[in-house]
Design a protein with these regions (language model features):
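Active-site-adjacent structural elements in enzyme catalytic cores
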Residues: 1-150
Length: 150
């Protein structure tokens, strides 16, 4: 499933994806995608048990809800927890590695009556959002399974 995302440490970029999706970042859940386990520990508090669980299951389709660190953007400092992901998708993880920063992400905006197919097809995503986002990355047809929250 495709998502909308931005540089995870740039406040204006985060505000922009929230405007596109019409959500309030202080009230709605956004997740951060990290490149590897060591980068996860920069943005979330990871104890030994959680580390072992993450090491066994990541990269993979999981979102871990963890206590955040003070390295998160100001928008999230009033929140105790943050959703952390390290998906089994080399494209997005490589972008995070090259940026040396997490990717802030949320599901694509959609209406309840819409076919979810557009969330899996980069060409359909480009038709719908190409004028309001900077870039649509074509990683091929995706699945529609959301991540499991841990």
């Amino acid at each position: 499933m495709y998502a909308i995302g931005c540089h995870g440490l740039k406040e204006r970029a985060i505000e922009r994806i929230c405007r596109i999706k019409e959500i309030d970042p202080r009230k709605n859940n956004l997740s951060i995608i990290c490149y590897d386990l060591s980068s996860i520990s920069e943005y979330a508090k990871v104890d030994n048990n959680i580390f072992k669980l993450m090491k066994h299951n990541l990269p993979g389709p999981f979102t871990f809800i963890l206590n955040g660190t003070n390295r998160l953007p100001k928008i999230f400092r009033n929140r105790k927890e943050v959703g952390i992901r390290m998906p089994d998708n080399n494209i997005i993880r490589e972008i995070a590695r090259l940026l040396d920063a997490p990717i802030m992400t949320t599901t694509l905006p959609y209406e309840e009556h819409e076919d979810l197919e557009y969330m899996t097809d980069p060409e359909l995503i480009d038709e719908k959002f190409g004028d309001i986002v900077d870039l649509v990355i074509d990683g091929g047809i995706g699945g529609i399974e959301p991540s499991t929250v841990v």
